[in-house]
């Protein structure tokens, strides 16, 4: 095979009814199948080129925009397209044309199918051969397109189509090293298996899977990073010969075979940001064999109330600008309240000291192997904590971990405070009205995440605690604070002062450190 888009020495024949012009054509072993774009319109086409008895070149072209392909055998495919004839400029007759194409080997047959699908879903914007625009695919709307704004998708694919952002993730050695260890420690799950890399990015996870002995890896990537992945994989030929890069969304592409294992890095801030987990679940339903494995297998969102006076004051002070009564002769104070609430609508992304937690954390589990995609549209988590110290509660701290449930080793990737920092950091939702609690007091509430079309979530947080004292025998006075935050617009507080430390009289009841040697870590995170 000369190239992924050219297939020499194929056989083909017409099998259409009623017969189209030239329907009696049958070529055995002497034709060349070429995928490409129309020179004038850029429309994707399959051209079958052969020489006749007089050595004259003949070409049969199939418009892929409305074509379908069906497998007849290991090396045989049926390409069906709709056509119409026109007489005197008037469309007169419509019919379907079916071309049976026979490849030389199963490997070429598989590559032919992949080329058919990739060219069918490709957008040629301008002349053939011009770069494709990020994030655009022709054809009927997929599930991704119906739930995600086109502008958001375009920005998303543009972002991940740049090598500098891929480098940022690759240099997260906690992330990359954990994936590598999870794959290599579970070679038995990969050896001789078919793997699909969902959202392959640079292709690094596909290369890991090939190192672990995968029979074949399909690296599916919708952004322009697919071209970079192809170059990286081609530059590692001993592994790359078992990897096929497919440019497209997992909701739209077709694969020639089912996968034994899916591998992906679909996690965003708070685990669910960017909504790629939904694509991961869709890929499971479309491509994974029954009982197949998923790396990662499950994810957990961890939550605990926190106290951080320094952070609260920092956020509140941001709105002081709007308390000016004479800003070039203008009174800004009418907007102070809105500005104050606006700053508190931003989740804070940073790394914080676990000693700021007011109680042991709880967690909410997402099982990627069984959950439905729709369960990710709205996530409702009840909150119930018991304060370990008496202090002011300034909000809810969140982080996540994921489990690679291999047959040999079960490995966790955690973003917990106190553990090695990742590019995800941790996330905190701040209450504009803090709560006052005493040691042993119950803190209740609700964390409600609602997905939206900008590939993120709106966060609705409610936290409550009872104020004891006069009238406590009747149950006390319930104090409640709420917040509405936008996960897509966080405050990245990556260069911050030392965290606020609780008062000396609070230190005796401090929480155990969230480190592997502590009982709290063992309970929540587990070890190999």
Curated annotation (Swiss-Prot):
<dbReference type="GO" id="GO:0032259">
    <property type="term" value="P:methylation"/>
</dbReference>
<comment type="similarity">
    <text>Belongs to the class I-like SAM-binding methyltransferase superfamily. Protein arginine N-methyltransferase family.</text>
</comment>
<dbReference type="GO" id="GO:0070611">
    <property type="term" value="F:histone H3R2 methyltransferase activity"/>
</dbReference>
<dbReference type="GO" id="GO:0006338">
    <property type="term" value="P:chromatin remodeling"/>
</dbReference>
<protein>
    <recommendedName>
        <fullName>Probable histone-arginine methyltransferase CARM1</fullName>
        <ecNumber>2.1.1.319</ecNumber>
    </recommendedName>
</protein>
<dbReference type="GO" id="GO:0005737">
    <property type="term" value="C:cytoplasm"/>
</dbReference>
<keyword id="KW-0489">Methyltransferase</keyword>
<dbReference type="Pfam" id="PF06325">
    <property type="entry name" value="PrmA"/>
</dbReference>
<keyword id="KW-0949">S-adenosyl-L-methionine</keyword>
<dbReference type="Pfam" id="PF25350">
    <property type="entry name" value="PH_PRMT_N"/>
</dbReference>
<dbReference type="GO" id="GO:0140903">
    <property type="term" value="F:histone H3R26 methyltransferase activity"/>
</dbReference>
<keyword id="KW-0963">Cytoplasm</keyword>
<feature type="binding site">
    <location>
        <position position="221"/>
    </location>
    <ligand>
        <name>S-adenosyl-L-methionine</name>
    </ligand>
</feature>
<dbReference type="GO" id="GO:0006355">
    <property type="term" value="P:regulation of DNA-templated transcription"/>
</dbReference>
<dbReference type="GO" id="GO:0005634">
    <property type="term" value="C:nucleus"/>
</dbReference>
<dbReference type="Pfam" id="PF22528">
    <property type="entry name" value="PRMT_C"/>
</dbReference>
<dbReference type="GO" id="GO:0035642">
    <property type="term" value="F:histone H3R17 methyltransferase activity"/>
</dbReference>
<feature type="region of interest" description="Disordered">
    <location>
        <begin position="500"/>
        <end position="528"/>
    </location>
</feature>
<comment type="function">
    <text>Methylates (mono- and asymmetric dimethylation) the guanidino nitrogens of arginyl residues in several proteins involved in DNA packaging, transcription regulation, and mRNA stability. Recruited to promoters upon gene activation, methylates histone H3 and activates transcription via chromatin remodeling.</text>
</comment>
<dbReference type="InterPro" id="IPR055135">
    <property type="entry name" value="PRMT_dom"/>
</dbReference>
<feature type="binding site">
    <location>
        <position position="251"/>
    </location>
    <ligand>
        <name>S-adenosyl-L-methionine</name>
    </ligand>
</feature>
<feature type="binding site">
    <location>
        <position position="166"/>
    </location>
    <ligand>
        <name>S-adenosyl-L-methionine</name>
    </ligand>
</feature>
<keyword id="KW-0808">Transferase</keyword>
<dbReference type="GO" id="GO:0035242">
    <property type="term" value="F:protein-arginine omega-N asymmetric methyltransferase activity"/>
</dbReference>
<feature type="binding site">
    <location>
        <position position="279"/>
    </location>
    <ligand>
        <name>S-adenosyl-L-methionine</name>
    </ligand>
</feature>
<feature type="domain" description="SAM-dependent MTase PRMT-type">
    <location>
        <begin position="149"/>
        <end position="464"/>
    </location>
</feature>
<keyword id="KW-0539">Nucleus</keyword>
<keyword id="KW-0805">Transcription regulation</keyword>
<keyword id="KW-0804">Transcription</keyword>
<keyword id="KW-0156">Chromatin regulator</keyword>
<feature type="compositionally biased region" description="Low complexity">
    <location>
        <begin position="500"/>
        <end position="520"/>
    </location>
</feature>
<feature type="binding site">
    <location>
        <position position="199"/>
    </location>
    <ligand>
        <name>S-adenosyl-L-methionine</name>
    </ligand>
</feature>
<feature type="binding site">
    <location>
        <position position="175"/>
    </location>
    <ligand>
        <name>S-adenosyl-L-methionine</name>
    </ligand>
</feature>
<dbReference type="InterPro" id="IPR025799">
    <property type="entry name" value="Arg_MeTrfase"/>
</dbReference>
<dbReference type="InterPro" id="IPR029063">
    <property type="entry name" value="SAM-dependent_MTases_sf"/>
</dbReference>
């Amino acid at each position: 095979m000369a190239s992924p888009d050219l297939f020499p020495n194929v056989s083909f024949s017409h099998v259409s009814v009623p017969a189209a012009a030239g329907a009696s054509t049958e070529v055995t072993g002497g034709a060349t199948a070429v995928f490409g774009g129309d020179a004038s319109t850029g429309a994707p086409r399959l051209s079958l080129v052969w020489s006749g008895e007089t050595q004259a070149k003949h070409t049969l072209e199939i418009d892929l925009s409305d074509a379908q392909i069906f497998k007849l055998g290991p090396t045989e495919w049926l390409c069906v397209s709709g056509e119409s004839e026109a007489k005197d400029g008037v469309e007169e007759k419509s019919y379907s044309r079916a071309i049976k194409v026979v490849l030389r080997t199963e490997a070429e047959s598989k590559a032919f199918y992949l080329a058919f699908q990739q060219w069918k879903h490709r957008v040629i914007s301008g002349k053939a051969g011009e770069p494709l625009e990020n994030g655009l695919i022709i054809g009927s709307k997929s599930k991704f397109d119906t739930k995600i704004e086109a502008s958001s998708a375009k920005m998303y694919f543009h972002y991940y189509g740049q090598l500098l952002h891929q480098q940022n993730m690759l240099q997260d050695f906690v992330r990359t090293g954990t994936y590598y260890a999870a794959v290599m420690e579970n070679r038995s799950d990969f050896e001789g298996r078919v793997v699909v890399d969902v959202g392959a990015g640079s292709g690094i996870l596909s290369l890991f899977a090939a190192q672990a002995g995968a029979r074949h890896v399909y690296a599916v990537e919708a952004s322009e990073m697919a071209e970079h992945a192809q170059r990286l994989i081609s530059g590692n030929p001993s592994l790359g010969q078992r990897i096929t890069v497919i440019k497209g969304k997992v909701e739209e592409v077709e694969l020639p075979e089912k996968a034994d294992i899916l591998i992906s890095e679909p996690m965003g801030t708070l685990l669910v940001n960017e909504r790629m987990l939904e694509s991961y679940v869709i890929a499971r339903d479309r491509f994974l064999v029954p009982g197949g494995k998923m790396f990662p297998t499950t994810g957990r969102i961890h939550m605990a109330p926190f106290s951080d006076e320094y952070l609260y004051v920092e956020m509140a002070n941001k709105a002081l600008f709007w308390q000016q009564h004479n800003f070039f002769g203008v009174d800004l104070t009418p907007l102070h309240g809105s500005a104050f609430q606006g700053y508190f609508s931003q989740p804070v992304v940073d790394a914080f000291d676990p000693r700021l937690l007011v109680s042991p954390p709880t967690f909410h589990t997402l099982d990627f192997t069984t959950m439905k995609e729709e369960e990710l549209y709205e996530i409702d988590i009840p909150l119930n904590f018991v304060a370990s110290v008496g202090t002011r509660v300034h909000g809810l701290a969140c982080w996540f971990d994921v489990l690679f449930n291999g047959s040999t080793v079960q490995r966790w990737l955690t973003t917990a405070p106190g553990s090695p920092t990742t590019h995800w950091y941790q996330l905190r939702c701040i209450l504009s009205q803090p709560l006052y609690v005493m040691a042993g007091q119950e803190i209740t509430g609700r964390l409600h995440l609602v997905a939206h079309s900008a590939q993120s979530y709106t966060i609705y947080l409610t936290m409550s605690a009872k104020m004891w004292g006069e009238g406590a025998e009747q149950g006390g006075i319930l104090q409640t604070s709420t917040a509405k935050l936008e996960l897509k617009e966080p405050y990245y507080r990556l260069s911050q002062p030392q965290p606020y430390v609780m008062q000396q009289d609070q230190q005796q009841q401090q929480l155990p450190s969230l480190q592997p040697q502590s009982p709290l870590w063992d309970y929540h995170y587990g070890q190999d």
